[in-house]
Swiss-Prot record:
Its EC number is 6.2.1.5. Belongs to the succinate/malate CoA ligase beta subunit family. GO terms for biological process: succinyl-CoA metabolic process; tricarboxylic acid cycle. It comes from Chlorobium luteolum (strain DSM 273 / BCRC 81028 / 2530). Substrate binds at N268, G325, I326, V327. Heterotetramer of two alpha and two beta subunits. Keywords: ATP-binding, Ligase, Magnesium, Metal-binding, Nucleotide-binding, Tricarboxylic acid cycle. Residues 9-248 form the ATP-grasp domain. Transmembrane segments: none annotated. Binds 1 Mg(2+) ion per subunit. This is Succinate--CoA ligase [ADP-forming] subunit beta. PROSITE patterns: ATP_GRASP, SUCCINYL_COA_LIG_3. Pathway: Carbohydrate metabolism; tricarboxylic acid cycle; succinate from succinyl-CoA (ligase route): step 1/1.
Amino acid sequence: MNIHEYQGKDILRKFGVAVPKGIVAYSAEEAKQAAEQLFAEQDSPVVVIKAQIHAGGRGKAGGVKLAKSPEEAHEIASQMLGTTLVTHQTGPEGKEVRRLLVEEGMNIDREFYVGITLDRATSNNVLMISTEGGMEIEKVAEETPELLLKIQVDARFGLQGFQAREAAFFLGLEGEQFRNAVSFITALYNAYTSIDAALAEINPLVVTKEGRVLALDAKINFDSNALYRHKDFIELRDISEEDPFEVEASKSNLNYVRLDGNVGCMVNGAGLAMATMDMIQLAGGRPANFLDVGGGASPQTVEEGFKIILSDKNVKAILVNIFGGIVRCDRVAGGIIEAARKIGLNLPVIVRLEGTNADIAQKMLDESGLNLIAADGLKDAAQKVNQALSA
């Protein structure tokens, strides 16, 4: 689960992670009042107005601006609120700006990158440090890997003092800046583990000319499987920032991820779903979604799955690929027939059913009178999808 920058900073602040003073604003008038308060409390000649959306690259898209007075903050907020911000992470449709973070200005000396996430290859948390703050860390890792330090942290023992110092040394810091960086990194790791985060990313981490070390930006992603331990975090979810198809799918406990292709996929099991998407791509099609109906697929979940797939106007054909282990193929077939009659499937539907009660399921589909295309094997299914698209 993703949250906004200001929410992430509020959480980090509770763990002793240094962040700038900031106030969230939902209107231009609130932005002006926030600026007045910050100007009264700080020496900086500017405040920063930051659009709050679940995407990076806001600065280049015009979502981060400086204001030298409360009146200018009001003007900037008026222009920014309600606009659609398009960045390299939002896609061409962009995201609407509904709230702003008004933050104290910083006298920046240097910018760095600090991030913590799980390294699935080693089953350890990994602390990532780079001298290239403000850059996309993937680009740094690919083009200048020598500027990125990765420190494996054994979850049994946590971040050790020598590891935090190694990170600060890598950044070339000395004296008070060095000590502040060590404290910052230690506090960030404690926050990351305490809240069951999947990612804690500070980009940039700034060192001011006064020697302060602060998180100028913060991105926190929660492990959704651990949210039952942090029920207070659930209220931080902003559904308006999420894909509406994915929100609707979550209501039916369907694992759905929207993609930009033209072939709707309904599969049971994440591994089979990934293989199905690969086969569609290899056959010349493009998957429009990842949809895992799970091991307990019922006629109701199949029907809901069809509704969500058909909500995407880019879908030109649908592939149903079910391997019946725990799931009975006849139950899935019943869901397909029921959904087809209720919804009115006007698109080509290719069905591949294997496993428990597959023969019964195929008979049900044959006798349904519906225009369903049977497939024998995954490769055959993918080829028939491509043929249907070409027809």
